[in-house]
Amino acid sequence: MVWLPRVPCVAAVILLLTVLSPPVALVRDSRPWFLEYCKSECHFYNGTQRVRFLKRYFYNLEENLRFDSDVGEFRAVTELGRPDAENWNSQPEILEQKRAAVDTYCRHNYEIFDNFLVRRRVEPTVTVYPTKTQPLEHHNLLVCSVSDFYPGNIEVRWFRNGKEEKTGIVSTGLVRNGDWTFQTLVMLETVPQSGEVYTCQVEHPSLTDPVTVEWKAQSTSAQNKMLSGVGGFVLGLLFLGAGLFIYFRNQKGQSGLQPTGLLS
């Protein structure tokens, strides 16, 4: 089901009623506020194959009347809305206009928003990291960060050594970024053992295949060895680059020397 944002049919109507006598009004301004507004909703099922239009009327934040295209007429939600429901249901032109809103309002707006809201796809960025840097065999929290994706329907699963984890999972839920993208954190409580491989798998409409990101549990000594190896490799590249630079510079200097008096 796709749902378009509810749009107020008119600006909220605020009625200010002054009920105090002038002498009291001079002491303080205590005018009561009354809020009356309505909302139009479009509910889509399987694209525009089935569409439901709702027009809901509220008074002081309480719904009192609605029109439902599935019903085809106005229905009172509270006694306050009953007079309006009876009045509008007795006017065929009003009922005809509301029933036609399924096409004139909902399907019409669906075509406008289709490319931006319905078909729009933004692939998520997925990263995995532990919340604590500490030795193995201690309680830790692995975080799968999924960010900057659209639409909001997404599935995130955790695996340990290829087997899905069903317990110890905590999620922040869907968080709006404010730029038409979402983010979420899905965390796995675990006690990592040396050699274990943890995988975060993400499925999203923007992806043809699930995205998987691994985190391998390594002992401190193994991590130090790996860092030493990477550091040695980088240092070797630096020395190699410096040697090549000096060599080619010397070669260029020698080729530029010629005996005086020769024609070239």
Swiss-Prot record:
Record membrane topology: Single-pass type I membrane protein
Pfam families under this entry? C1-set, MHC_II_beta
Q: Does the keyword Nucleotide-binding apply?
A: no
Q: Cytoplasmic compartment: which residues?
A: 247-264
Positions glycosylated per UniProt: 46
* Annotated ranges, domain Ig-like C1-type: 124-214
Provide GO CC annotations from the record: late endosome membrane; lysosomal membrane; MHC class II protein complex
- The name of this protein is H-2 class II histocompatibility antigen, E-Q beta chain
Which organism is the protein's source?
Mus musculus (Mouse)
